[in-house]
């Protein structure tokens, strides 16, 4: 976990707990994504990180447009001078929400694009293996030669040709 992730996690967790408790998950998810996109804009990031304007002043300017609770959340982040990590807070909020909804992300790396039926079959197999709904993110990397590398959380399933060749190489060299 990166330093930014460690800093963002308590904010994301607090936001999730509040939003979940008050049935506001969708609303807060959208608000966090919106502010995340705003902060990613270079001109907004420049204003937020400006030494002449405090982050609290930036958030105060938005007070009338925001729900009181979300404003208070942003004010806390601004008070701690952490507005620039808003994209990470939003990402972690979404990760916590997926875990809460029993959804896990599977990063699937393939050597080349493949048939939808094969991907559906892989998704079904992963859902059975992990006992949850799988949200697959497909990446193409010709370097794996063939097969697939699947990462779900801390679990890595390497059934790629390059992975098998590496294992064979290490066996032969030992």
From Swiss-Prot:
Membrane disposition: Peripheral membrane protein
SUPFAM superfamilies with a match to the protein in the record: N-terminal domain of the delta subunit of the F1F0-ATP synthase
Domain of life: Bacteria
One GO cellular component term noted in the UniProt record for this chain: proton-transporting ATP synthase complex
InterPro entries: ATP_synth_OSCP/delta_N_sf, ATPase_OSCP/d_CS, ATPase_OSCP/dsu
Keyword Transport: yes
Compartments, as annotated in UniProt: Cell inner membrane
Molecular function GO terms recorded: proton-transporting ATP synthase activity, rotational mechanism
Keywords: ATP synthesis, Cell inner membrane, Cell membrane, CF(1), Hydrogen ion transport, Ion transport, Membrane, Transport
PROSITE patterns linked: ATPASE_DELTA
Broad class of where this protein is predominantly found: membrane
The keyword Flavoprotein belongs to this UniProt entry's keyword annotation: no
Subunit text: F-type ATPases have 2 components, F(1) - the catalytic core - and F(0) - the membrane proton channel. F(1) has five subunits: alpha(3), beta(3), gamma(1), delta(1), epsilon(1). F(0) has three main subunits: a(1), b(2) and c(10-14). The alpha and beta chains form an alternating ring which encloses part of the gamma chain. F(1) is attached to F(0) by a central stalk formed by the gamma and epsilon chains, while a peripheral stalk is formed by the delta and b chains.
Role according to the record: F(1)F(0) ATP synthase produces ATP from ADP in the presence of a proton or sodium gradient. F-type ATPases consist of two structural domains, F(1) containing the extramembraneous catalytic core and F(0) containing the membrane proton channel, linked together by a central stalk and a peripheral stalk. During catalysis, ATP synthesis in the catalytic domain of F(1) is coupled via a rotary mechanism of the central stalk subunits to proton translocation.
Entry's family note: Belongs to the ATPase delta chain family.
Protein name: ATP synthase subunit delta
Species, as recorded: Francisella tularensis subsp. mediasiatica (strain FSC147)
